[in-house]
């Protein structure tokens, strides 16, 4: 349990699990805002009574406890954090309503099917679809030569796509197929490096080496299901 919590009426607690990219996304958002909090690591095979009490519908992490009141689901939590601490740190969501809507569009990017596809025509089709989707992201970054999708600092789209920066290289290693290269996606490739070097991610870096065996097992499970 990490002792990163706010004193007094704004005491904040986060229930999470080390391997979850959704939990990492919330931790990065809290870091952007400079929010101190208590972190509670959950065993998802033996969920605590506190987690079940605070998220009785989905019974999963992350759950943020703020002034004794729970907020569940990572996307909801990130927006809550941005609004609850609007006076601190950088803005996560754009102020402009249209830009805010466009940022929300990328909350769940559909690029992961290629990891679950078996070698052969199915994998080739999934890779082709992933390349098309990544090209859209490449073009978004290339316009104006932006450092991040939000501009000069990490924002909602960067947090939503952040798992790509460390999961895609792991997928490539496991499958043996290169997807994001400097030649094919120069802006996106550079963004992945910048994102991993950004302050919120360096505060809570993804545990890549610990994750690799987990993703290899997931890949095998997907293939065996086919």
For the regions a protein language model found, what residue spans apply to each?
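Short amphipathic alpha-helical segments embedded in low-complexity Lys/Glu-rich regions
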Residues: 47-48, 116, 178, 208-213
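Alpha-helical scaffold segments in carbohydrate-active enzymes
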Residues: 105, 133-136, 160-167, 187-197
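GST superfamily/GST-like fold recognition
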Residues: 151-175, 183-189
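GST-like domain detector, emphasizing the conserved glutathione-binding G-site
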Residues: 1-149, 153, 220-223
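Membrane interface segments of multi-pass transport proteins and intramembrane proteases
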Residues: 93, 178-182
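Surface-exposed helix-capping loop/turn segments at secondary-structure junctions
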Residues: 139-151, 173-175, 199-205
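A contiguous, mid-protein "functional segment" used to position or interact
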Residues: 183-209
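C-terminal helix/juxtamembrane-tail motif
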Residues: 209-226
